[in-house]
Amino acid sequence: MASGSMSSYGSGSWTVKQNKAFERALAVYDQDTPDRWHNVARAVGGKTPEEAKRQYDLLVRDIESIENGHVPFPDYKTTTGNSNRGRLRDEEKRMRSMKLQ
């Protein structure tokens, strides 16, 4: 999910395994869950509720950057010449118009 062009979400002391557990926990413990960040931190393991909330805030900021066009789409190269170029541009336009819920 994270890349070098994004903020520190997915980097630092968060392992890939912890990030996956974090993402799963967010799906289980929604914003209406009492003690959400305590539950998320417990599901991740080795993180405090404050660290879980900070990681969430970074994720939200990254998503907003993507939605606002601040993170460029990769320039994928095709091996068949320009035959897929139009489709890639259409996909890029579609992705730019999408808003994540």
Swiss-Prot record:
Q: Could you list the residue ranges that cross the membrane?
A: none
InterPro entries per UniProt? Homeodomain-like_sf, RADIALIS-like, SANT/Myb
Any one Gene Ontology molecular-function term assigned to this protein's record:
DNA-binding transcription factor activity
According to its UniProt record, in which tissues is this protein expressed?
A: Expressed in the funiculus of ovules and in embryos. In young ovules, expression is observed in the adaxial side of the funiculus (the stalk connecting the embryo sac to the placenta). Also expressed in heart-stage embryos, in the cortex and endodermis of the hypocotyl region but not in the cotyledons, shoot and root apical meristems, provasculature or epidermis. Not detected in young seedlings, mature roots or in young floral primordia.
Q: Which CDD domains has this protein been placed in?
A: SANT (cd00167)
What functional role does this protein have?
Probable transcription factor. Required for female gametophyte development.
More details: Assigned as a member of the MYB-related gene family, I-box-binding-like subfamily.
In its UniProt entry, what is this protein called?
Protein RADIALIS-like 2
Source organism per entry reads: Arabidopsis thaliana
